[in-house]
Every structure is written in C-alpha cells, then in structure tokens.
Amino acid sequence: PTPLDDLKAALRFLTREKPNLLKMVLLASALNFVVLGYGAVGYAFVIRTQWGFDATVYGIADGLISVATLMGMLIVTMMAGRLKIGHMTKILTLLGLTVIPQGVACMLSGGNWTRLMALVAFACIGDVICSCANIIAVPAIQMRTPDAMLGKVMALLSALAMCMQPLGQMAYGWAFDHLPAAAIFIASGAVLIAMALLSASLFAHFDD
C-alpha cells in the first residue's frame, strides 16, 4: 500500500471505530495551527519589527523560550503518571490564559524592555503548559489505537500537523501585517479557551 492508502485506512478506522480519537487528532491539529502560528510568526514580528530589537536580543528571547520548553518537557515527563486525559480542559484553559497576557504586554506603557520581559515570561509559562498537553494527547492516541493501525494513525497525525504548521504561519503572517499584535494574541488566547470548553465533554467521555 502507498502512504496515501495508509492515510485513508487510518481515516476510515478513526471515523468508523474511534470517533473520539479522530476528534483528538483534529484538536491536536487545530492546536498546532494556533500555537505554531503565534509562536513562530508573532514573536519574531513583535520583537524585531514592532519593538525594534536586534537579532541578539531576539536570539536570547527565543533561547529562553526554548529552554523553558525543554524544562517543561523534563518536568512533565516526571509527572506523566499523574497527567490524565481529564486534565486537558484545565491545561488548555491555562494555556489560553498565558497567551492573553502576551497581548496585554504589547499594550504596556513601560517601554519596550518591559513589554519584552512580560512577553517572554508568559511565553515560557505557556510552553511549559503546552508540554503538558503534548504529553497527554499523543500517548492518549497511541494507547487507544490497535497495534495494526498505530503506524497509520500516527502518520495521519503527523501529516495533519505538518499541514497545519505552514497554514498557521501564513494565516498569522497575514494577521500580523494587518491587525494589532495585541488583538491577535488576545484572540488566540480566547480561541484556546473556547477550544478547551468545547472539548470538555470529549475529555470527560473519551473512552465511552
């Protein structure tokens, strides 16, 4: 079978036998669209273009966020046994609540350095929380997928994630060119909170 056949088989399996897994795969793809969109495009645009910091400052800020991501993964790995699918609603809500202050940071009147420190601080916290979501969502899909379909389902998840990344970057690139950065971050946080609330029943009845 070709890779396309595998993706079709995975989609048929999820649609007919595991609709909740399909919803989780789609939710993960939507999260990639939003998080990679504001993260990959927004930080560079705001720090370099709007606030006028040089490459060194941006590199340090990006490095701090990356370190926070790694630390988050280590911390979350140690807590993996305590993290359950039922925690996803709270985790996604908290993630949204770290993005909204990033929009508020863009409106602070204390100067660009104050804005930068606030943005990076909440971005670091958000990345740690995002690590929690990843450590729950991916194993949740893997553990509930039969061995015979596991490779196909994970390939579908990877394909959707790869598609969402450039689409998110293009959409957010357009948005940051035409809309205030503060509004984009605040709207993104609100979208994440809405996704959490709309998915609450999915997480509560995931194995039904």
Description of each model-found segment:
Residues 1-26:
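Juxtamembrane intracellular "pre-TM" segments in multi-pass secondary transporters
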Residues 30-40, 130, 165:
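Conserved extracellular-gate-facing transmembrane-helix segments in secondary transporters
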Residues 15-16, 35, 48:
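Residues at helix-coil transition
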Residues 8, 43-208:
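C-terminal transmembrane bundle of multi-pass solute transporters/carriers
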Residues 19-20, 38, 84:
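Generic structural signal for secondary-structure transition and capping sites
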Residues 23-27, 41, 69:
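Transmembrane helical elements of multi-pass membrane transporters/channels
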Residues 23-34, 157:
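Alpha-helical segments in transporter systems
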